[in-house]
């Protein structure tokens, strides 16, 4: 009998020593944290989140860490709670709102009055990190298969353009079954909307915000960046719903 794809994956940290971590911006010690995560150390996971997504900010090390995070998230050799955390981290990194410059300063995503994103100076680690997640996320989706889990919805919300069809089927099943927790249903509804290529306008963003009182309060208070397109806002809301589904209200401020 053939093993599931996630069991057939190679060593998730293969090639880790070939990356010059100490030479990368914010890269010192990332290799050891990845090893700790692979061994099931949740403290190492928390440290990775802080290092690779510091206050919603990615860096050179973030982009280089993505292939290893993907393999951790796709491998059944890694404990399930670590896989979940890593997949959520990948989704959050793809949605990051800021990036570190070569001088260690933060540059944030900004939009003009027409809601077109303004260019950033190189190196643009926001774009590089998102591209890295998009490139390898299909490996995670393949490994998760039809699992009806929040981390799958979070990743689908973050990079819907690379999610295979079966993920939309999973999202549809969760959203309309009427048997799943509310936050997971909310996340699945957002994922399905994005996976079907539906347009998000301000009305849809407001409707999406109804899923949680804190999200609605933040939206009505104008706490999202000026001129941010509603599609981005919907993604951020959907990610929060998925995270709440997995970890509850006590973790609402994550990322």
Q: Which ranges hold each PLM region?
A:
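Alpha-helical solenoid scaffolds in large eukaryotic transport, assembly, and signaling factors
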Residues: 11-74, 84-99, 121-129
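Long, low-complexity, highly charged intrinsically disordered regions
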Residues: 1-39, 202, 217, 221-233, ...
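Eukaryote-skewed repeat-based solenoidal scaffolds used as protein-protein interaction platforms
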Residues: 74-76, 80, 84-202, 208
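Extended, charged low-complexity segments
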Residues: 193-255
